[in-house]
């Protein structure tokens, strides 16, 4: 009944930096050709959304943020064959067109149709589907899920198991997949290896789960908040250390803990250049691999001693855990349904959508791992 019509609904809008999101009534236009309109039913509050609000991640405002979600297809535009109305779906901030070099290479996963690099805040045709008070509102990284309805390109949505609980599998849209894949897909952690995970938030805990699933013999959690250690050990960390407890740099501490060898794999899941260097220099000088998972602020630059690379270390970045989104998300949902991994321990708070700013307060204060908002 709503197909082909403008839908009026609630959305949380970021009008300006460092201000609470504002719940407004917006108009959501019908999907154009090759686009899909989705009724969002559950969405997670992620640090990347907070980076936009704080100005660390520069994006055009006003904007509907949110990118980790699950919902049901309301209607589709002309030419869409991958989903139909009524399908349960997850929006994809890392799209998969299947045609570009990254999509066609077995090594790649960052499709050229992504809006991560350009940050245009618009649909592929250069326009928006959102308006509020007569003003055009920007989209966020091909998704925009802090709204009852959103419109995405068909490259940015995938159908999932209809029996999946959306309030849990929404985490597969970003946080869980990013961390789990960093270990399984990007680093390709080997059985018996030693891993160090810097940052034990939701994504960091998902890295821990990935390291455990890959068969790592030691998984060392690193965080300055010792309150996170019990949960990290529950998820698979074999030991946890607080850099503030030591007089020497944390990379030296990790060398001491590994008989002077360094770790096989390290993961920076904070988004700070200082910890990226610490994680990198914690690795075995020749065999070690360090993966940057945390999103750094726009203006950050890294200075390091190139001899650290010369000896043979590998330094890698990773987006969405290295997964090809359309290929991997349905399989990850199926794996969850088959109890191959758990998501419940990552979800510390479930709130109604109207309490979205409370969700961000919990994130900023370090009191939550993941807050899921329910519509």
Curated annotation (Swiss-Prot):
Keyword Metal-binding belongs to the record: yes
EC number(s) given by UniProt: 1.1.1.1
Name of one Pfam family that matches: ADH_N
Reactions it catalyzes: a primary alcohol + NAD(+) = an aldehyde + NADH + H(+); a secondary alcohol + NAD(+) = a ketone + NADH + H(+)
Any one of the GO CC terms: cytosol
Subcellular location: Cytoplasm
Complex formation: Homodimer.
Family: Belongs to the zinc-containing alcohol dehydrogenase family. Class-I subfamily.
Protein name (Swiss-Prot/TrEMBL): Alcohol dehydrogenase 1
Protein species of origin: Naja naja
């Amino acid at each position: 009944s709503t197909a082909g019509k403008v839908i009026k609904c609630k959305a949380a809008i970021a009008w300006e930096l460092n201000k609470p999101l504002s719940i407004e009534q917006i108009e959501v236009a019908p999907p154009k050709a090759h686009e899909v309109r989705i009724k969002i039913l559950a969405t997670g509050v992620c640090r990347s959304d907070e980076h936009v609000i704080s100005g660390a991640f520069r994006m055009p405002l006003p904007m509907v943020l949110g990118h980790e979600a699950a919902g049901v297809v309301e209607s589709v535009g002309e030419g869409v064959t991958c989903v139909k109305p009524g399908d349960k779906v997850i929006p994809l901030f890392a799209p998969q067109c299947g045609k570009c070099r990254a999509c066609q290479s077995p090594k790649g996963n960052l499709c050229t149709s992504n809006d991560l690099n350009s940050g245009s805040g618009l649909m592929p045709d250069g326009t928006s589907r959102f308006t509020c008070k007569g003003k055009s509102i920007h989209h966020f990284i091909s998704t925009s899920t802090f709204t009852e309805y959103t419109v995405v390109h068909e490259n940015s949505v995938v159908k999932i198991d209809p029996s999946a609980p959306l309030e849990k599998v929404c985490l597969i849209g970003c946080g869980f997949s990013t961390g789990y894949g960093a270990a399984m897909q990007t680093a390709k952690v080997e059985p018996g290896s030693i891993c160090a995970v810097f940052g034990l938030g939701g994504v960091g805990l998902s890295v821990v789960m990935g390291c455990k699933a890959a068969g790592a013999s030691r998984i060392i959690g690193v965080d300055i908040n010792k309150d996170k250690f019990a949960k990290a050990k529950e998820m698979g960390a074999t030991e946890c250390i607080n850099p503030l407890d030591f007089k020497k740099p944390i990379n030296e501490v990790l060398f001491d803990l590994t008989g002077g060898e360094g770790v096989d794999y390290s993961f920076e899941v904070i988004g700070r250049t200082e910890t990226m260097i610490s994680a990198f220099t914690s690795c075995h000088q020749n065999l070690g691999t360090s993966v940057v998972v945390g999103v750094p602020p726009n203006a950050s630059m890294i200075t390091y001693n190139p001899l650290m690379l010369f000896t043979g270390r590998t330094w890698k970045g990773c987006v969405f855990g290295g997964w090809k989104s359309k290929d991997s998300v349905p399989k990850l949902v199926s794996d969850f349904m088959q109890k191959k991994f758990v998501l419940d321990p990552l979800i510390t708070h479930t709130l109604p959508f109207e309490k979205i700013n409370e969700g961000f307060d919990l994130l900023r204060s370090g009191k939550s791992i993941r807050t899921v908002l329910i519509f």
